């Protein structure tokens, strides 16, 4: 039984129409398992939003609730300023989703597949098919059979199919999974362009480097609980990764681990990889020198979204 605690809009009138998606206290339990716990999300128009977490984190359950496929146990979901507890289809018509590999007729051309879909939707002219194929750079291959398409072309045709109805929110689940480098770049280049057309893109992916390149903001969850929610650049500039070579890495790791302001210490052969507050290198040197441990090398290592993700999730990958 779904319980929605409040039917009042989550969005106040001063925020305008920029907020496309908002959840408040979103929770889903399967028996005793709490798959999603008290999740608060917000997605604005023009934004590419990354939704990240290890396997089993609750990403698919969350997407299912947003799309009306899974009933929340408690909490609220609001699309375009309206709760999904009302006439949800009015809101969901404005949402497009590509979940895993799109399903098309393999023996039909790209054009004919979209034409069949347009007939099923109704009131979509042929000019719109031309427009969306051109939008995803497939117009010159529209006459080719679907089963002759590369993986990247199939994924772009899937995105084209969602664009037939001009969605204001596009949900993409692993859109570059299984693609070769060329296909990955094609999809990666397309995603921010879609958001810049007064839409929002909700992106689920385990390819953290790709997320770092295309997303404006990310939420990271683990076991249904939000661990981080911030602009990508903010996450990348919060700390400092230092690569340190010392004469006694074991003792050095013990000393640094006991410093309350050190975030983490990992050992890689003769090196220590230290996640610490910005501009703390001199303090680290001082702490080691007081125990007669001296760094022969201390250099900055670039902070990546992957390193932030692994730190927050305790080493769980997104695969």
Locations of the language-model features?
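ABC-family P-loop ATPase nucleotide-binding domain
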Residues: 1-27, 315-319
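ABC transporter nucleotide-binding domains
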Residues: 18-23, 28-222, 228
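Generic structural signal for secondary-structure transition and capping sites
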Residues: 48, 103, 158, 168, ...
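Structural motif detector for alpha-helix initiation sites
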Residues: 110, 232, 302-305
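ABC transporter nucleotide-binding domain
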Residues: 186-275
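Short low-complexity, flexible loop/linker segments enriched in glycine and/or proline
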Residues: 219, 311-314
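Short, charged/small-residue-rich alpha-helical element at the C-terminal edge
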Residues: 241-312, 319
């Amino acid at each position: 039984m779904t319980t929605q605690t409040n039917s009042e809009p989550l969005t106040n009138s001063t925020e305008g129409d920029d907020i496309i998606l908002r959840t408040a206290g979103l929770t889903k339990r399967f028996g005793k398992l709490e798959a999603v716990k008290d999740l608060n999300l917000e997605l604005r128009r023009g934004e590419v939003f990354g939704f990240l977490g290890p396997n089993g984190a609750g990403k698919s359950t969350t997407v299912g609730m947003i799309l009306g496929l899974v009933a929340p146990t408690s909490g609220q979901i609001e699309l375009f300023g309206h709760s999904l507890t009302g006439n949800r289809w009015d809101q969901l018509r404005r949402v497009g989703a590509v979940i895993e590999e799109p399903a098309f007729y393999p023996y039909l051309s790209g054009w004919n597949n979209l034409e069949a879909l347009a007939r099923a939707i109704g009131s979509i002219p042929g000019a719109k098919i031309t427009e969306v194929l051109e939008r995803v750079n497939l117009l010159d291959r529209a006459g080719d059979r679907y089963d002759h398409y590369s993986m990247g072309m199939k994924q772009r045709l899937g995105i084209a199919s969602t664009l037939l109805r001009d969605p204001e929110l596009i949900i993409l689940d692993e859109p570059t999974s299984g693609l070769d480098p060329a296909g990955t770049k094609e999809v990666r280049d397309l995603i921010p362009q879609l958001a810049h057309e007064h839409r929002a893109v909700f992106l689920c992916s385990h390819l953290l480097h790709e997320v770092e390149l295309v997303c404006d903001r990310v939420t990271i969850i683990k076991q249904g609980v939000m661990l981080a929610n911030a602009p990508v650049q903010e996450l990348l500039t919060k700390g400092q990764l230092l690569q340190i070579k010392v004469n006694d890495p074991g003792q050095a790791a013990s000393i640094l681990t006991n410093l309350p302001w050190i975030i983490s210490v990992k050992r890689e052969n003769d090196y220590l990889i230290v996640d610490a507050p910005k501009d703390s290198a001199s303090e680290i040197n001082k702490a080691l020198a007081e125990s007669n441990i001296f760094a022969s090398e201390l250099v900055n290592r670039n902070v990546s979204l992957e390193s932030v993700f692994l730190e927050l999730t305790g080493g769980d990958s997104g695969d």
